[in-house]
Every structure is written in structure tokens, then in C-alpha cells.
Curated annotation (Swiss-Prot):
Gene: E4
Organism, as annotated: Human papillomavirus 39
Compositionally biased region (Polar residues): 49-58
Lineage: Viruses, Monodnaviria, Shotokuvirae, Cossaviricota, Papovaviricetes
Pfam families per record: Pap_E4 (PF02711)
Processing after translation: Phosphorylated by host ERK. The phosphorylation triggers a structural change that enhances keratin binding and protein stability.
Subcellular compartments: Host cytoplasm; Host nucleus
Entry keywords, A to Z: Early protein, Host cytoplasm, Host G2/M cell cycle arrest by virus, Host nucleus, Host-virus interaction, Modulation of host cell cycle by virus, Phosphoprotein
GO terms of biological process kind: symbiont-mediated arrest of host cell cycle during G2/M transition
Note, other: The major E4 form is first synthesized as an E1^E4 fusion protein from spliced E1^E4 transcripts, such that the first few amino acids of the E4 protein are derived from the N terminus of E1.
Main location: host cell
Biased composition (Pro residues): 22-33
Region (Disordered): 1-62
GO cellular component: host cell cytoplasm; host cell nucleus
Name of the protein in its database record: Protein E4
């Protein structure tokens, strides 16, 4: 019965006893607010400016080089025995 449109006075005949009774209009359900669409674009490393910096001026046992972009940080180091270490962090 809920799916069919049946006049309220047919379902509840006592409402006919009230003078000037009118079926109230159906309320409009509130709309859910929409989240703003995000602009997304995959950035390539070649599109970005990169910044390269050297290790501090003080001598260290294992000097390193840091290369940064908008989405990555790369640290390169070479130990005294010649072992090369590269660590890249992608954000």
C-alpha cells in the first residue's frame, strides 16, 4: 500500500470529519551537499623543477648528495670503501 498513491482520506476516513482538511504536500527530501571536485593531474618528474644540494661543508666519513623535486627526495651517498647507497622517497 505504501507504493501506491492512495488519498489519505481513503486510508484514514475520520479525516473527512474535519472541515477544510487538505492533504499536506509531500516534503522535498534534503539534498546531500556535493564535495567539490578535486583537480588532479599526475606530475612527471621532468615537469618539475629539481633542487640539488651537497652535504654540509664540514668533512664527514660518508658525504651525501640530496636531490629534491615536488614529489621526491633522493639521498645519494658513497662510503669510504666505495659502496654507493641511493634512497628515494616518493611523496
Amino acid at each position: 500500500m505504501a507504493n501506491r498513491e492512495v488519498p489519505v482520506t481513503d486510508r484514514y476516513p475520520l479525516l473527512n470529519l474535519l472541515p477544510n482538511y487538505q492533504t499536506p504536500p509531500r516534503p522535498i527530501p534534503p539534498q546531500q551537499p556535493h564535495a567539490p571536485k578535486k583537480q588532479s593531474r599526475r606530475r612527471l618528474e621532468s615537469d618539475l623543477d629539481s633542487v640539488q644540494s651537497q652535504s654540509p661543508l664540514s668533512p664527514t666519513e660518508c658525504p651525501w648528495t640530496i636531490l629534491t623535486t615536488h614529489s621526491t627526495v633522493t639521498v645519494q651517498a658513497t662510503t669510504q670503501d666505495g659502496t654507493s647507497v641511493v634512497v628515494t622517497l616518493r611523496l
